[in-house]
């Protein structure tokens, strides 16, 4: 008559089976073709001149706009930001002041938020997070957000808005 296995062996075997059941199986092992990761364009720095090329004037170009130095691809909102659309004036530039003031006045279509009221700054943060970050992919940053005028690093840069990406995909 066979002796029953000691309990520790059964527990070890059960733990091993459970661990193997919970480990994800790579798709190549499962006989599936791996799908490429769904990624947008690589994140990059934009000068004012480069960003201006994406102002919605060219039919075959994406439409970019920046708020708080973060560049968003708003092409999916072409009816709002494309050529002749109501908010086209915001496209192709950092229009943080205009967004904060809810203004399309050319004097307000700038990155400069100096002199804005607390209420306007709160409105800017609200639109930034609830509209742009919630709806549109981040494709980069304005050079001004990362660098000072003299080329030195901007110590006020906070990477909280930076999307997760692999550096190898950026070059």
From Swiss-Prot:
The gene is Nenf. One of its GO terms (molecular function) is metal ion binding. This is Neudesin. Interacts with PINK1 and PARK7. Non-classical progesterone receptors involved in extranuclear signaling are classified in 2 groups: the class II progestin and adipoQ receptor (PAQR) family (also called mPRs) (PAQR5, PAQR6, PAQR7, PAQR8 and PAQR9) and the b5-like heme/steroid-binding protein family (also called MAPRs) (PGRMC1, PGRMC2, NENF and CYB5D2). The keyword Signal applies. Belongs to the cytochrome b5 family. MAPR subfamily. Residues 1-30 form the signal peptide. The keyword Ligase does not apply.
């Amino acid at each position: 008559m066979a002796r029953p296995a000691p309990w520790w062996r059964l527990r070890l075997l059960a733990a091993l089976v459970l661990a193997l059941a919970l480990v994800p199986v790579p798709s190549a092992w499962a006989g599936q073709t791996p799908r490429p990761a769904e990624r947008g364009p690589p994140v990059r720095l934009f000068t004012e001149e480069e960003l201006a090329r994406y102002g919605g004037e060219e039919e075959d170009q994406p439409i970019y706009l920046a708020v708080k130095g973060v560049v968003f691809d708003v092409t999916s909102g072409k009816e709002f930001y494309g050529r002749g659309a109501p908010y086209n004036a915001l496209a192709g530039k950092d229009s943080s002041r205009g967004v904060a003031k809810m203004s399309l006045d050319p004097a307000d279509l700038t990155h400069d938020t100096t002199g804005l009221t607390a209420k306007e700054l709160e409105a800017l943060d609200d639109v930034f997070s609830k509209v742009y970050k919630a709806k549109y992919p981040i494709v980069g940053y304005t050079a001004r957000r990362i660098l000072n005028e003299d080329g030195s690093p901007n110590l006020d840069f906070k990477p909280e808005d930076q999307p997760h990406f692999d550096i190898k995909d950026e070059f």
